[in-house]
């Protein structure tokens, strides 16, 4: 009888372990800045208009070559009220994705730990207990960060190792953190690869750096973020299908009704710039039916295309849609 009881407990324990799951989201929140001047960073566009009236600021802005960016630098009114409204919109989109929000959220384009902490405080009532952001070298100060319902045990930035022709260039590092789900260590890699206007080789080097990182250990891993590979580039270079031996990729596994995460108005087409990728053969699997982009009235226009935050109307969040998935362990 005792042996039967032990066997029964073992079976139920095994079932519970195999049914463990976490929900994750990646969200490029497009220029989530606080309203303060961050020394050493080029954040002068994201200040209140009242602080932009001095001669030094105006002269610095007039040196900006791109007209749109110059006008933002001179006239964009990024107040505390505007920032707080954007944070509230982000919170609502996150909570729309899943009851009380996903377990782990990887963010891209966050200025600093201060503004991430403000978002964390808004999300705390929904079970979030930890956050992480390490300052990288981006000249504008935009970084990657996490907010999590699991304790974050380890934090490290990994610089991209570029080929000789790109040695003079720098880009955002890969942000690795560790969490434990029960006794299982899971490694996460937050991605914000070089923008599409940079050479394809820079993104190829970024993928190589990521592959080298995950090949150094045998733990299950999740890479999620803004890979910045357009649909055209992906088709021409077979970017993601080449990875399928070792990776399961969100929009290959599910998201059947999704169009993409970013819309290019000039070309009138969608791209999956943002993805969730998980290790194959290391105990992880997607719940394919769970994979989706998060579309609400708050973060899209009438055509369900993502819209950046408008300080005048208070509508929008980002030119990216967040992507969400449940991952089984």
Model-based region annotation:
Residues 2-20:
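Classical Sec-dependent N-terminal signal peptides that target proteins to the secretory pathway
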Residues 24-29, 73-79, 83, 97-116, ...:
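Active-site beta-strand/loop signature of hydrolases that rely on acidic residues for catalysis
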Residues 104-185:
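Structured beta-strand-rich core segments of catalytic domains in phosphoester-bond hydrolases
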């Amino acid at each position: 009888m005792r042996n039967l009881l032990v066997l029964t407990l073992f079976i139920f324990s095994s079932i519970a372990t195999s049914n463990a799951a976490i929900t994750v989201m990646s969200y490029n929140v497009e220029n989530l800045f606080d309203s303060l001047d961050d020394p050493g960073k080029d954040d002068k566009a994201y200040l209140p208009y009242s602080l932009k009236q001095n001669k030094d600021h105006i002269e610095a802005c007039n040196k900006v070559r791109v007209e749109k960016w110059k006008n933002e630098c001179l006239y964009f009114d990024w107040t505390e009220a505007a920032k707080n409204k954007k944070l509230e919109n982000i919170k609502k989109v996150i909570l729309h994705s899943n009851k009380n929000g996903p377990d782990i959220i990887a963010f891209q384009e966050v200025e600093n730990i201060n503004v991430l902490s403000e978002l964390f405080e808004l999300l705390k009532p929904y079970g979030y207990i930890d956050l992480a952001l390490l300052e990288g070298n981006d000249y504008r100060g935009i970084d990657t960060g996490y907010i999590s319902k699991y304790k974050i045990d380890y934090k490290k930035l990994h610089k991209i190792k570029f080929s000789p022709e790109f040695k003079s260039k720098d880009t955002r590092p890969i942000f690795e953190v560790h969490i434990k789900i029960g006794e299982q260590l899971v490694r996460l890699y937050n991605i914000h690869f070089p923008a599409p206007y940079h050479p394809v080789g820079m993104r190829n080097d970024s993928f190589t750096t990521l592959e080298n990182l995950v090949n150094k250990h045998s733990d299950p891993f999740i890479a999620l973020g803004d890979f910045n590979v357009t649909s055209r580039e992906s088709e021409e270079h077979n970017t993601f299908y080449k990875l399928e031996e070792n990776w399961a990729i969100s929009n290959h596994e599910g998201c059947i009704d999704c169009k993409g995460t970013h819309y290019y108005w000039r070309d009138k087409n969608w791209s999956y710039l943002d993805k969730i990728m998980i290790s194959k053969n290391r105990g992880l699997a997607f719940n394919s039916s769970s994979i989706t982009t998060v579309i609400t009235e708050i973060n899209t226009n009438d055509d369900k295309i993502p819209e950046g935050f408008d300080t005048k109307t208070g509508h929008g969040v980002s030119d990216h849609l967040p992507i969400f998935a449940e991952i089984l362990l």
